[in-house]
């Protein structure tokens, strides 16, 4: 590679470098000791010095120097790992610069010109290799060269970043370099002549954590299936851990969770991932989780600033977040103040004049005639310019038509109270295009229910109407006061005060609207007018597996509530669930969605319920609603760790917290709706829409804390489950205006003693007071940590189930079968790493049966066959692998699963001789052997085998053995014993038989009994050729049985004949085998097996025990080397073709 020119004195390097060639201005040198074998003492000393110091010259032992005539100062301008690489640079210099330099008179001009050219080349090379995105591109380029030379990965394996650190081997630290690439974690150490290389694929990492040991307080521990590795002594351990966490998460989800995982656009191409991309992704995910925004929202800028907060009459310090469609603000102090400004609501963004009190201010005005003042903004001009550009784009894509009549109507319906200003309507949130569009929408979807179901099916509570209304009015009054001070639209100030109001329970008349506000579903609703109605029409009447599942669960959704004892509620629920399944087929429909949607329909209109469901499924509970509920399982593991941290006594008593975590699955999936009375559970949903998943975590901890004493005294998991069920069933809501609606899993005790009742408001208040200290950032970090474990847990489950299915059907030892599965999966993964992107669904499909989830193609199978097959045939191995793949590919989809792969190996290693011969036989007839088979194409029309061999041979002791009688008797016996129920294999033609013999011949190569095997196969081949000729003549005359004996008796011994005739010579009677006659020549499996059984050496060869363990050990070592060699050879071939 090209180097940034730096001046050196050549006389100081005379002993270390040897000049290979030179010109007027350039010198090409080789590091002394490189390529000299074990020769000279000086070379060995320099090599030892480089090894001890881990010098760059060990990796790049060639360099080119710029020399200016008359100067003793030289400048290295290029280095290379090989002579070919450095010669390419030398040739470029000769062709492009050497003649140009001769026109310069001033030597300083020569140096400046060359250095400028080299720097331009470096910039171009840097741009192509993404190094310009690193903080120190020169050092990164050097590290990149070392990484490529030390680990010999294909070019597709891109280095992301590197760090100096120690890897602990027992109690001994090894100082070296940690290289983090897109698919692997690599460590290299070379000290005092001892080299250590460590390569760990990210997909093999089962645990990534920060730990402490006896020697060091802070280390990073990597846990794989078999080993633990500790890394320490980083300059910035926090940064390293975050990058490793991001890389592991991206790679694991890209390769193992492709069912629902969508990469950010910047990470779509793995080979383009850089450290900055990972940092941006982490910041993006925190931003979306903190403000609960759509997953496609991309963060553009984070700026420190201060916001004028009228309720506190001062400026509040914090940070502004600017994204595609939002301007958000969060105060430095957690919970103090937060705002979300959709750009759809923004009217203008203006710069104000700077003053000493208001430095660098801007004003953001929204449609409800409220302005937000930000000050102390760095780079204000560029920020405002970018915000205005995005504002213009949002308004162009989603024009807003404000309808005051609709707003007045909604404001009077929902908020019968005074407001901050006359135009500050809650109805702004609806953003209806116009009254005409609203009417046309109703005409378009006449079946859509116009109101929330709770208004049509209002129940009378046990309390008096006056008492119920008075409590509701008090809450409404408190909320109205809050709206006056903090705002009532989606752009309201969100403070600790509103959290307290939410914890008390939102009034029923405001509940649906505030859910829309807190989740920001109102923005989706306003941005997609008519979208839901179109979905309903498109999905109406369609029948599929998803609609059948929905129909099955419709009547299980809040059956106690009168709204869902009526076709009106059932029909609305059906439309919303079917429309969502039509919108998002990746999720489709999952159980528990029906319970959540039914509650949403109680308090919101049908279309609003749909957008709330979108918000919950796609951003508030990511990855919850899919076939494997990965997101819910991750949060269960997070919840388990939170129990250990906040309730240590309970965790100590219950050694296995997985039981509590499994009980909590329904808490997370249904937001407590399925295990708590409805009038209490809706208060939980209130908190969820305001605080997100944090509210569910802290409420779960509060439930366990309230029952900790009883749980500690419980004897088993069943009793603990009953304790929690009884407690949750007796949570009441004293402020609920409606009658109690029981939970789906109410617990009834035989005891007559009344169980104490817990008020939901008290429980929620306790959860905030005792467990409300968890931040979004902490929860996201825990999710990263546990997502690795959950995904690897799924992989382990898949592996165990595959082995459970396959073990009874094969004779391979379970531990060897496990090793084979790991090799099979690793082969699949390596193709995902370095080959061109292919549709992942055709490879790893979690919805398929366990044994068929990982599948490999013909090329991958050939690699594995070469590594683990006992039938090594030299150059013929690849051809045999192709035929084996075609045989195993029953459905002709060019993919095979693990079960088929193992069943084939089982026959090769553990099968009886007849099974092995049958497999070989099938490999040489269609479909395994095709007309286009590359090894079966021969320019000769005549057979390659002689058929004039005798049927009488001499034994070593001089006795003669007549095979005629034996052969005839064997054929008769086989005909009698043949299993009529088994499908008969087609007979083998002469061409196919020739290929069969070639395979046997190549299998015997380098065997200890090679000579005996060749003599035996010569005998067997002659027998079979004679049988084929007899059958051929018999078929032409119609009396095969009579002619068989005559033909055999007519055979004359001829010791000079060879089994494999010289292909360069054609027998004189070659014309006796025309094409038609060749087609008539056939032998059967029974003939081949009977003939092979006549030779003891062949029987011994096929029945000798084979060692699979040694093969597997070699395969584990060589699998990566074989793949990288093939990839590098392929890339070199492509390079040569491109040069041509």
UniProtKB/Swiss-Prot annotation:
Q: Per its UniProt record, what InterPro entries does this chain match?
A: EF-hand-dom_pair, GRAM, PH-like_dom_sf, Rab-GAP-TBC_dom, Rab-GAP_TBC_sf, TBC1D8_PH-GRAM1, TBC1D8_PH-GRAM2
Composition bias, kind Low complexity: at what positions? 1032-1043
Q: What does this protein do?
A: May act as a GTPase-activating protein for Rab family protein(s).
Q: Which residue stretches belong to region Disordered?
A: 1031-1070
Rab-GAP TBC domain location is 505-692
Q: Which GO terms describe its molecular function?
A: GTPase activator activity
Per the record, the domain comment is: The arginine and glutamine fingers are critical for the GTPase-activating mechanism, they pull out Rab's 'switch 2' glutamine and insert in Rab's active site.
Question: What species is given as this protein's source?
Answer: Homo sapiens
Q: Which GO terms describe its cellular component?
A: membrane
Task: Cite the position(s) of the site with description Arginine finger.
Answer: 552
Site residues, Glutamine finger: 591
- According to UniProt, the name of this protein is TBC1 domain family member 8
């Amino acid at each position: 590679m090209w180097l940034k020119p730096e001046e050196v004195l050549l006389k100081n390097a005379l002993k270390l470098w040897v000049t290979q060639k030179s010109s007027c201005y350039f010198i090409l040198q080789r590091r002394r000791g490189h390529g000299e074998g074990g020769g000279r003492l000086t070379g060995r000393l320099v090599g030892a010095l480089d090894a001890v110091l881990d010098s760059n010259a060990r990796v790049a032992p060639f360099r080119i120097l710029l020399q200016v005539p008359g100067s003793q100062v030289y400048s290295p301008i290029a280095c290379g790992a090989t002579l070919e690489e450095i010669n390419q640079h030398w040739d470029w210099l000769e062709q492009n610069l050497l003649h140009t330099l001769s026109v310069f008179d001033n030597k300083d001009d020569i140096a400046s010109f060359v250095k400028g050219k080299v720097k331009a080349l470096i910039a171009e090379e840097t741009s192509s290799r993404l190094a310009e995105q690193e903080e120190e591109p020169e050092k990164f380029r050097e590290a990149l060269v070392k990484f490529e030379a030390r680990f010999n990965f294909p070019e597709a394996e891109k280095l992301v970043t590197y760090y100096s650190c120690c890897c602990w081997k027992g109690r001994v630290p090894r100082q070296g370099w940690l290289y983090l690439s897109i698919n692997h974690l690599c460590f290299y150490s070379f000290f005092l002549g001892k080299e250590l290389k460590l390569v760990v694929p990210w997909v093999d990492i089962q645990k990534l954590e920060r730990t402490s040991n006896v020697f060091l307080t802070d280390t990073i521990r990597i846990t794989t299936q078999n080993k633990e590795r500790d890394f320490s002594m980083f300059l910035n351990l926090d940064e390293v851990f975050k990058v490793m966490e991001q890389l592991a998460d991206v790679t694991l989800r890209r390769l193992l969770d492709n069912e629902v995982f969508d990469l950010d656009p910047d990470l779509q191409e793995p080979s383009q991932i850089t450290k900055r991309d990972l940092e941006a992704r982490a910041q993006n995910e925190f931003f979306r989780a903190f403000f609960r925004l759509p997953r496609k929202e991309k963060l553009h800028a984070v700026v420190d600033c201060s916001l004028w907060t009228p309720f506190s009459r001062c400026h509040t310090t914090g940070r502004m977040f600017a994204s595609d469609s939002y301007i958000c603000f969060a105060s430095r102090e957690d919970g103090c103040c937060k705002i979300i400004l959709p750009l759809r609501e923004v009217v203008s963004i203006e710069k104000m004049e700077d003053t000493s009190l208001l430095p660098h201010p801007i004003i953001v005005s929204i449609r409800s005639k409220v302005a937000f003042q930000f000050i102390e903004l760095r780079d204000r001009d560029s920020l405002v310019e970018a915000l205005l550009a995005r504002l213009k784009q949002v308004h162009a894509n989603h024009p807003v038509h404000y309808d005051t009549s609709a707003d007045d109507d909604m404001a009077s319906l929902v908020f019968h109270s005074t407001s901050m200003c006359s135009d500050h309507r809650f109805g702004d949130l609806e953003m209806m295009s116009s009254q005409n569009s609203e009417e046309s929408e109703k005409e378009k979807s006449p079946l859509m229910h116009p109101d929330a179901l709770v208004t049509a099916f209002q129940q009378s509570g046990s309390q008096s109407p006056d008492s119920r209304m008075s409590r509701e009015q008090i809450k409404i009054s408190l909320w109205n006061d809050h709206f006056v001070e903090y705002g009532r639209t989606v752009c309201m100030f969100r403070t600790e005060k509103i959290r307290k109001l939410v914890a008390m329970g939102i009034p029923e008349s405001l509940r649906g609207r505030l859910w829309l506000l807190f989740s920001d579903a109102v923005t989706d609703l306003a941005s997609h007018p008519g979208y839901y109605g179109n979905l309903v029409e498109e999905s109406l009447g369609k029948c599929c597996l998803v609609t059948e599942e929905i129909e099955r669960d419709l009547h299980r959704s809040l059956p106690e509530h009168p709204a869902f004892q009526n076709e009106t509620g059932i029909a609305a629920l059906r439309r919303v669930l079917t429309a969502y399944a039509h919108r998002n087929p990746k999720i489709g429909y999952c159980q528990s969605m029906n319970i959540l949607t039914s509650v949403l329909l109680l308090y919101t209109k049908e279309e609003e319920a749909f957008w709330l469901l979108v918000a919950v499924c796609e951003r508030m509970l990511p990855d919850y609603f899919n076939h494997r509920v990965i997101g819910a399982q991750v949060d269960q593991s997070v919840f388990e760790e939170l129990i250990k941290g906040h309730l240590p006594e309970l965790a100590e008593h219950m050694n296995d917290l997985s039981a509590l975590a499994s009980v909590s699955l329904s808490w997370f999936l249904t937001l407590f709706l399925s295990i708590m009375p409805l009038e209490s559970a809706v208060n939980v949903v209130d908190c969820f829409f305001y605080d997100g998943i944090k509210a569910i975590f802290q409420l779960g901890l509060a439930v366990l804390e309230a029952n900790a004493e009883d749980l500690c005294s419980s004897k088993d998991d069943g009793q603990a489950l009953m304790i929690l069920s009884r407690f949750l069933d007796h949570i009441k809501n004293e402020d609920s205006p409606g009658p109690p609606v029981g939970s789906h899993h109410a617990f009834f005790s035989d005891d007559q003693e009344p169980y104490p009742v817990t008020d939901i408001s008290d429980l929620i208040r306790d959860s905030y007071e005792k467990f409300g200290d968890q931040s979004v950032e902490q929860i996201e970090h825990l999710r990263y940590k546990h997502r690795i474990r959950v995904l690897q847990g799924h992989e382990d489950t898949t592996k165990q189930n595959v082995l459970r299915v396959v073990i009874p059907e094969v004779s391979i030892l379970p531990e060897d079968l496990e090793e084979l599965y790991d090799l099979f999966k690793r082969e699949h993964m390596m193709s995902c790493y370095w080959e061109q992107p292919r549709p992942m669904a055709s490879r790893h499909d979690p919805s398929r049966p366990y044994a068929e989830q990982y599948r490999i193609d013909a090329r991958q199978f050939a690699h594995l066959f070469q590594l683990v097959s006992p039938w090594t045939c030299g150059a013929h191995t690849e051809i045999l692998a192709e035929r084996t793949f075609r045989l195993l590919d029953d459905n002709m989809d060019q993919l095979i699963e693990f079960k088929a792969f193992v069943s084939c190996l089982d026959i090769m290693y553990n099968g009886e001789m007849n099974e092995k011969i049958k497999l070989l036989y099938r490999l040489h007839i269609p479909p395994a052997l095709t007309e286009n088979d590359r090894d079966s194409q021969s320019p000769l029309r005549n057979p390659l085998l002689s058929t004039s061999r005798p049927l009488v041979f001499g034994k070593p002791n001089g006795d003669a053995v007549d095979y005629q009688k034996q052969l005839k008797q064997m054929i008769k016996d086989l005909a009698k014993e043949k299993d009529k129920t088994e499908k008969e294999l087609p007979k083998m033609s002469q061409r196919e038989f020739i290929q069969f013999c070639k395979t046997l011949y190549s299998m015997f190569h380098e065997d200890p009994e090679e000579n005996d095997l060749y003599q035996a196969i010569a005998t067997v081949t002659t027998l079979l050729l004679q049988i084929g000729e007899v059958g051929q003549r018999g078929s032409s005359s119609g009396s095969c049985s009579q002619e068989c004996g005559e033909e055999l008796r007519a055979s004359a011994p001829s010791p000079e004949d060879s089994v494999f005739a010289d292909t360069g010579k054609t027998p004189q009677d070659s014309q006796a085998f025309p094409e038609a006659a060749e087609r008539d020549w056939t032998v059967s499996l029974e003939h081949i097996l009977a003939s092979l059984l006549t030779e003891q050496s062949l029987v011994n060869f096929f029945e000798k025990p084979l060692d699979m363990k040694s093969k597997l050990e070699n395969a584990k070592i060589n699998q990566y080397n074989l793949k990288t060699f093939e990839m590098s050879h392929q890339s070199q071939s492509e390079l040569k073709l491109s040069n041509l």
